[in-house]
Amino acid sequence: MHYLANHRRLRLAAAVLPLAMGLGLHAARAAEDSLPGDGIAQPLNVNIGIFYNLFTNAGKVGAVHGGSYDKDTHISTDITVARYVRTFAVDGFVSGVQVYEPYVAFIGAQGAGVANIAGPYVPALGGQLPAYGAGRANLSSDSGFGQPNFGVFSYLINRPDSGTYGVVSPWISPPISGFNKDKSLNPGQNVWTYEMELGFRTTLLGDPNGQNLAVELWSESYFFGANNNSALVEPQVSANHIPPIYGEYNLLSGGAIPDANPLQAASSTPARFNEQPSQEFRIYLPYEFLPATRAFISPGFYQSMGGKQTYTLRNGVKVDSGNRTNESQLRLVAASFVSQTTQIMLIGEYDLAAHGAPLNRNVEIRIATFF
């Protein structure tokens, strides 16, 4: 049981620069990812209120092909999540229901650096014109509520004596959010989202009720509906230094070839948005060093795959956004109960790789209270 954007593609003449990235829905998911200790079955008939606050910051974008680019990029969010969990028994199994609602706030002006803006292909001027060079895409954004999520769960394995647990938790998320199809970045995609979550935990060394080292594994499978009222958003694009030769090209083309910024104005084309199924895996190795407060520290690793995102225009043309749910991330988690009913958890996350998406450096705090 895990406690708790629209995409853009730059086109310049015949050159296509993929700058797709999934914020909003994926960022909100990250705020309430399964964390160490969530695999332990809780007592029956308790209420759990959980507050999350996640700060994400990206100074570079993971490349679709080749290396990442770390100039002129700022993509930053402050995500808060409120969550409620209630446990009860079903046929002798610890089970329950849960719901959470995220709010995604974009911090400051959002933008992504562009390593190289290719020049247009103009046969009348000899074919491929020189590149404009490095530049920046200005990303419009809308803060707001993400999609609500509703789930149920049941611990089919519950062996406290050996510290072994197994949980099954399906989720559903209706397409209700602060989505604005004309923005580059959004708090959600407004698609029906279905998730199947599986968790397993067991003690490797030590006593489950004392100092111990455990392993916790999580698998999450996502399936998505379509958003028929979405749009393919093109950001405003500017070059850092436009080659002087473009002054001549501008004159020769009667102004058709830009020689001044912005090279491309922002635009929005109505389209249907689709996302293919995606898969996520997490592994944690929590070491509980102070049993009196259940204090632990845990390294972790996260990997996602799949999730190809496409737009189908009204004329039937399908555009690959370039974005995938393909991310590799290191994690470090520490937590302790500060009273009999309140736990505080700190999480640090560092992206190693991301396919066409921000390489995030995240800090998160989670406060859970039992009543």
PLM features: residue spans?
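Hydrophobic, lipid-facing positions within transmembrane beta-strands of outer-membrane proteins
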Residues: 47-49, 78-82, 146-152, 166, ...
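Short loop/turn motifs that connect adjacent beta-strands in outer-membrane beta-barrel proteins
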Residues: 37-45, 87-97, 110, 157-166, ...
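Transmembrane beta-barrel domains of outer membrane proteins
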Residues: 40, 85-87, 153-156, 197-205, ...
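Outer-membrane pore/translocation modules
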Residues: 105-274, 316-324, 337
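Transmembrane beta-barrel strands of outer-membrane/channel proteins
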Residues: 49-57, 97-103, 168-174, 213-223, ...
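Bacterial N-terminal signal peptides
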Residues: 13-24
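Outer-membrane beta-barrel biogenesis signature
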Residues: 24-50, 60
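Outer membrane beta-barrel transmembrane domains
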Residues: 62, 121-126, 232-371
